[in-house]
Amino acid sequence: PPDISIFPQPGKLADSARDGFLVPLPDDVTAAVSQNWSDGAMGFGNVDGTQFGVPDKTDLKSLVWYQPARFEANGYTVPTTLDELFALTETMIADGNTPFCIGIESGTATGWTFTDWVEDMMLRRHSGDTYDAWTTGELPFASDEVSGVMQEVLDVWNTPGMVYAQGGSIASTSFRDNGE
């Protein structure tokens, strides 16, 4: 096996550690790396109190971009809650505007942006403990919480007038350039 592996999901790292496929990091490595990462970030590589990994990067996702000039021209107020956001989307559709541009095409990785939406919605609709139980496999995808959130995302995406998809459909539109 390799000396170093990159795990895109902390849950897979935890599973591999618990199954005995990983060795703990040396204390000096953990100490050195922890000087540059928060306890929360270090927690992604910590399994049951033992440090098996460290972050190698972070991604900033889950942002909603908007055009301030269009908001001003239409008299829209920037929402601060999810309920306000959905109320605004209804107003935008009634005004003939399309609230979202969404694309999930990403070659063999198509669909990861859907999971980002689901993760965001899980965190907004349920507790952090529920989210953690889901990401560690304790809460199955078939649970009411997870399946309900997935359905909510699909309902948003399938609302007539809600989504602009440059490629003709959300699945065939690249996540990279849908807003162009």
Regions found by a protein language model. Give the residues of each.
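Glycine-centered hinge/linker elements that transmit conformational signals in sensory
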Residues: 89, 135-171
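Aromatic-glycine-rich donor-binding/catalytic loop that engages nucleotide-sugar donors
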Residues: 69-79
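Extracytoplasmic/periplasmic solute-binding protein
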Residues: 47, 52-56, 62, 86-142, ...
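Stable alpha-helical elements in mature extracytoplasmic
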Residues: 9-12, 21, 41, 67, ...
